[in-house]
Structure formats: C-alpha cells, structure tokens
A protein has these predicted regions:
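Beta/alpha (TIM)-barrel catalytic core signal, keyed to glycine-rich beta->alpha loops juxtaposed to Asp/Glu
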Residues: 9-11, 111-300
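N-terminal small/glycine-rich loop or linker at the start of catalytic domains
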Residues: 1-2, 57-77, 107
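Short, acidic/polar
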Residues: 4-17, 83-97, 145-151
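Acidic (Asp/Glu)-rich catalytic clusters
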Residues: 19, 43-49, 96-99, 152-156
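N-terminal binding-site loop/beta-alpha segment at the start of enzyme catalytic domains
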Residues: 1-53
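Active-site groove signature of glycoside hydrolases
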Residues: 95-114
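Active-site mouth loops of central-metabolism enzymes
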Residues: 1-7, 72-88, 114-116
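Glycine-centered flexible beta-alpha turn that most often forms the glycine-rich phosphate-binding loop
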Residues: 25, 103, 139
Length: 300
C-alpha cells in the first residue's frame, strides 16, 4: 500500500485472492493513513468473513504526538504509541473501518525503543485483555528482536511475528528463528519480492521518483541490485522448466527456506494476485531447490 492505487481494482484484487483460495488478508491503519483498512472493509462486504484470516496492526499514531517519532508519511508525522489506551482505541477504530466484530490477528506494528516509556508488560496485557473480550483471536508482533519475543511470552503470549524476509534479506534466520522455534511462535514474512526487485522486471537502469521507499532500500543500491539481477538471470532455465514467472519461482523458494513460513505477498491488481497464486502449485525438484539455495547463500 504505497503510491497510487485504484480502489475498485484493489477490491477486485482482494476478491480474486479469496476466490483463488488465499485466506490471509493483512492490512494496517498506517497504510494510506487508514485508507487501506477502508478498502479492505469494502472488500469484506462481498466476502464470507469466515473464509479469511484478517490481520491488522496497532501502535502507530498521528492524531497526537508522543515522545517517539516513527517517520513522516506523506507529510504527516507518525509516532509510536504502545500504551494500553492507544492499542485499545486502535482496535476499536480498526473494527469499525473493517466492518467486523473481531480480528483474527492483531500485530503491534513497530516496537518501542524505550520500554521505560511503554512497558512491554502494559502492551501485552492490553492485547491479552482484547483477546479475552473476543475482539482479537491471536497476538502478533512485527519488527521485533529475540528479547522482545521473550518479553511477550513472559507477560502473556505471542502467536506470530511478521518480519521482513526475502532471498536478499535473511537476518531473521539467525536472529529470530531459534527463539521462535523454542517458544512455538509462528513466522510470517513480508516483502518476499523485495519491493519488486525479485520479480525479474527491475534492471540496473530502473529509477524511482524522489521519496520512493526503494531508493532507501539497501537491496536496491547498485552493488546489491547487480547481485540480485545476476541471481535471477541464472535461473532463466528454471522458469522455462517449470513454465513459471520469476516471481513465482522466488515465492516458491522463499516458502521452502524456512519450514512452516507464511509468505505474505502484496498485489495491486487481480493479475498480480493470479501470478502470486501460481507459486502455490510450483513444486521444486530437490536438486533445483538445493541449487537455488546455494546460489542465494553465495550472495548472503
């Protein structure tokens, strides 16, 4: 959810995803400054709510200032607020925008850099209370550390984390996965296509307007971008062998990198949804998977 989107097309994309068997719809208040949740809510009017796992997030605030500035989005200053009051208010408002009486998963979007300001115990207790009330079904956290994961489990529970993970961004393998396995926390990966870089459509000559988030993405810097393009070019024979797109190949491999990984793929149009869905039926031969993982390891 960034840049220009056609709302009707977005609703159609969500409907297409559910028709194709996609069950998890993820959004957040910060995406489009509430607009994403409103669009998802419109789509849910035409979808059997029981068919989908619906997740959204809390903890980012732009109606009032807090001591923790997160970033500026489209000229609006966004702050982090992990207080119990903010979390509970966020959920009540998200439920209204989404037109539902419960969330299947609630994530804290970003964690507080100062636990003295927003004690983790207070944050978790608020989420546990919402779960007891039936307003959320599972507790999630995004952009965490191993210590934060342990803190959630100490003060209540943590069902799932949502972290950036791709063939180019693999920090969670060593930093978070051991803790998640120990404590039984599931993992959902966002940005598996690295903002489009791993679709095979980006070249060294591709440029983006000022302010585009890709310009600050380390994977888009010249050296790393060249590695990514060379990696994908080396798999041209595999896209031919499996009759698939580069994006489908990358999604299929990403899902195999971590057992039980939930791969969250963004899509603006029904066509992009269908391309993503095609990765589900792609079964990589053992030798091909080993080869591709070796290629990925060689640039890590």
């Amino acid at each position: 959810w960034w840049g220009d989107n056609d709302d009707a097309l977005s609703v159609n994309a969500i409907e297409t995803a559910v028709e194709q068997g996609i069950r998890w719809i993820d959004t957040a208040p910060i995406y489009g400054l509430y607009h994403s949740e409103q669009v998802v809510g419109e789509a849910l009017r035409h979808i059997d709510r029981d068919k989908v796992v619906l997740s959204t997030k809390c903890g980012l605030e732009w109606r009032h200032e807090t001591p923790v500035l997160h970033k500026v989005v489209d000229g609006t200053a966004v702050y982090r607020d992990l207080s119990a009051q903010s979390i509970i208010e966020d959920v009540e408002e998200s439920l209204k925008r989404l037109g539902t009486d419960h969330l299947d998963v609630l994530y804290t979007h970003w964690q507080s850099p100062d636990l003295g300001l927003y004690p983790l115990e207070e944050t978790v207790e608020a989420m546990m209370k919402l779960k007891e009330q039936g307003k959320i079904r599972a507790i999630g956290a995004s952009n965490v550390t191993a210590d934060i994961i342990r803190g959630y489990c100490k003060y209540g529970q943590l069902d799932v984390i949502q972290e950036k993970y791709s063939l180019l961004t693999r920090r969670i393998e060593k930093q978070l996965l051991p803790t998640c396995r120990e404590l039984g926390v599931s993992v959902q990966a966002y940005s598996p296509l690295e903002q489009g870089l791993l679709t095979g459509k980006v070249t060294m000559e591709t440029t983006y307007p000022e302010g585009n988030t890709r310009n600050s993405n380390p994977s888009y810097q010249p050296g790393r971008r060249a590695q990514a393009i060379k990696l994908l070019d080396g798999w041209a024979d595999l896209t031919e062998k499996y009759h698939c797109t580069t994006a489908q190949l990358v999604i299929a491999l990403t899902a195999k990198m971590i057992p039980g990984l939930h791969v969250l793929c963004g899509a603006r149009t029904p066509e992009q949804v269908l391309d993503n869905v095609g990765a589900r039926s792609l079964k990589l031969d053992g030798a091909d998977a080993v080869r591709m993982k070796w290629d990925v390891d060689s640039i890590s």
